[in-house]
Design a protein with these regions (language model features):
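Membrane-interface transmembrane helices that cradle and orient dolichyl/undecaprenyl
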Residues: 100-124
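Membrane-interface alpha helices of multi-pass inner-membrane proteins
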Residues: 122-137, 171-177
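Perimembrane helix-loop-helix junctions
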Residues: 143-176, 186
Length: 254
């Protein structure tokens, strides 16, 4: 971004991938207004998220109705909608498009039988998924890596098998090769003495916005869990952050 800061420039793309923004940027070059280009981007992300979720859940369940239900549940998740329509967290809701592909990759890993080779055609989805996370929202990428670590510990007997480890190592290798052009400058800048590496005190914010386990399945909003930024912000007063009771019913039925 050479035009930022009165012509001094600011390399924001090094720390925050913007590959997904080429679509609205192209619309802008074609004469579409900024507002309409952004609306088109949101529409594309919503359609893409629904389609990717449907594909992943169809591969997992093998049933079209189950896949459609899972896609609706994921696409209409309160937090995802809040990221779009309340917080305008573009990087975050863009990254959510790729998360079902990560889930699918570990489904492939877990269902593989002992010494059964996991075919090459099952590499595309996870590589695209991890690449999408890296290129859209690095924080989501780190959070996903943390959850994968916990997942691998829980299912260590099924993960630490020769065929599964070979499959996962190929995913890691291909993902790194595809994203080295982004990862190397990112790590170089992280090693510099910039403000982005400084420690910030987040305790009050965590206590204000955090949710305990019981609140994760709340149906209605309260003063802690919603995105209320003013008395007149009516939509944010009605946007809860928990996963909702629908997910609780799904888990109970499972």
């Amino acid at each position: 971004q050479p035009g930022w800061f009165n012509g001094w420039g600011y390399p924001v793309s090094i720390m925050y991938g913007d590959q997904m923004l080429y679509f609205p940027a192209l619309l802008r070059l074609l004469g579409v207004s900024v507002q309409n280009a952004y609306k088109c981007y949101i529409a594309a992300i919503n359609l893409g998220t629904a389609a990717v979720a449907y594909y992943a859940f169809l591969k997992i369940s093998g049933d079209k109705k189950t896949a459609l239900f899972g896609s609706c549940l994921y696409t209409l998740a309160p937090y995802r909608l809040s990221c779009i329509y309340v917080r305008a967290a573009l990087g975050e809701y863009s990254a959510m498009l790729f998360l079902p592909l990560i889930i699918l990759s570990f489904w492939y890993a877990l269902k593989a039988k002992e010494d059964e080779a996991i075919t090459t055609d099952k590499l595309a989805a996870p590589v695209i998924g991890f690449t999408g996370l890296i290129q859209t929202h690095v924080l989501t990428c780190f959070l996903t890596a943390f959850m994968i670590l916990i997942f691998c510990i829980i299912y260590r007997k099924r993960i630490f098998r020769k065929n599964v480890l070979f499959y996962l190592s190929r995913i890691v290798l291909l993902t790194l090769l595809l994203n080295l052009w982004f990862i190397i400058p990112f790590l170089q800048y992280m090693g510099e003495d910039f403000v982005v590496t400084a420690k910030a005190e987040m305790t009050p914010a965590f206590q204000r916005w955090g949710a305990n386990f019981a609140e994760l399945f709340a149906v209605y909003w309260n003063g802690t869990l919603n995105s209320a930024w003013g008395e007149l912000a009516s939509i944010s007063q009605k946007f809860p952050k928990p996963v909702g009771s629908a997910y609780l019913l799904v888990m109970a039925g499972a």
